Amino acid sequence: MTPQELTVAAVQLESQASLDDNLEAVTRLSRRAATSGAELVVLPENFAYMGSEEDKRELAEPVLVEASPSDGPILCALRALARDTGAFIIGGGMPERSADPERPFNTSVLVAPDGRVTASYRKIHLFDVSVGDGQLYRESASTSAGERSVVGDVRGVPVGLTVCYDLRFPELFRKLADGGARVATVPAAFTLMTGKDHWHVLLRARAIESQMFVVAAAQCGRHPRGRMTYGKSCVIDPWGDVIAQASDGPGFVLRALDLGRVDAVRESLPCLTHRRPIG
């Protein structure tokens, strides 16, 4: 039987180019969230590192289910955090080794309280844009794209995994809903330019279209090389309402999700079952 409530936390960070400092912030805020009752803690994209792409490549690790001597510092930290807190941890957007050593995957990992990686999702949609903020984004030059959608399990609740720019592709969220997801997670590092106009609109749209909760953990503030991110980590319900939002700056937002709300919305407005083939 699917649980009817899940308490989630979306952690907001201002990650920099120091792996050690970033992991210290991750550990500190995640512990606070778990102590406050979070059963699932979602970290933002690039939670471990927001420096140069060249250095990020050097941090790429294999992602294995069980703890292994090949684990790098990022996955070791996530496993330890999950074990110590008893919470599930989603590390959204860490560099995972790929067949191309110059282009690791941007991978969201779901780590269970026993330290095992029970699901991992490789970001499909890569951020190749120019949005007028003085930065040129070409994620595909340094990152390999994933190919498959992933729904993990958190205490019996199906949870869909995405990363940042995936938010702009509604078909992925519908795929997650079709795969049973009742919650979608969006670890992100939205730019200040796009975030102020699109962040809440897109999150609410994805929640409304797929009739599930959306938990969005964001980077905020200033980062190396002049990059600025929007923040506003939040939780959206299946009706599209913003039911929790972080304040400015690093921290976290906590919310107990009434999963019966998913059933109620899907029964009252059965869009997912009303779909028809379009020629």
Predicted regions mapped to residue ranges:
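Cys-nucleophile CN-hydrolase/nitrilase-fold catalytic domain and related Cys-dependent amidase chemistry
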Residues: L19, T27-D114, S120-R122, T191-R206
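Beta-strand-turn-beta hairpins that frame and shape the catalytic cleft
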Residues: M1-V8, V151-G160, V183
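Active-site catalytic loop in hydrolytic enzyme cores
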Residues: A67, A80, A99-G179, L192-V201, ...
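CN hydrolase (nitrilase-like) catalytic-core segments centered on the catalytic cysteine
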Residues: A67-I90, P158, C164-V253
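N-terminal active-site segment of His-dependent metallophosphoesterases
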Residues: M1-L40, T185
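Short beta-strand scaffold segments in enzyme catalytic cores
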Residues: G91-G93, N106-L110, V150-G152, S233-V235, ...
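Residue-level recognition of beta-strand->loop/alpha-helix junctions
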Residues: Q12-E14, P44, R122, A218
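A short C-terminal boundary segment appended to hydrolase-like catalytic domains
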Residues: G260-G279
